[in-house]
C-alpha cells in the first residue's frame, strides 16, 4: 500500500490556514499573546494567498480578515494603555 503525498496546493492551503490559526492564538490566548508574532503570521499567510488554489482563497481570506481585525483591536488597545501611563511632567 503506497501512501499518497500531498500536493503543493494542499500544503500551501494547510500552511496558510496554520498561519492564520497561529496569529489568532497569538492574539487571544493570554499565555501565548505576542502581537508581533501574530503580525508576522498574518503577513506570511497573506503572502501565500496568491499561490493557493482559487477555491481555497475565500475561506482563508475570511479568517485572515477576522484575525487582522483582532490585531488592529489588540494593538490599538495597547497604544491607548501606553498613552494613559503617567510620565514626569504630565498632568
Sequence positions of predicted segments:
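N-terminal intrinsically disordered, cationic/polar leader segments
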Residues: 1-44, 58-66, 70-91
Amino acid at each position: 500500500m503506497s501512501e499518497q503525498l500531498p500536493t503543493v496546493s494542499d500544503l500551501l492551503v494547510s500552511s496558510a490556514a496554520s498561519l492564520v490559526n497561529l496569529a489568532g492564538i497569538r492574539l487571544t490566548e493570554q499565555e501565548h499573546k505576542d502581537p508581533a508574532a501574530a503580525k508576522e503570521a498574518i503577513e506570511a499567510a497573506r503572502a501565500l494567498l496568491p499561490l493557493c488554489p482559487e477555491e481555497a482563497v475565500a475561506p482563508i481570506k475570511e479568517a485572515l480578515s477576522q484575525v487582522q481585525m483582532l490585531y488592529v483591536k489588540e494593538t490599538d488597545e495597547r497604544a491607548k494603555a501606553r498613552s494613559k501611563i503617567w510620565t514626569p511632567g504630565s498632568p
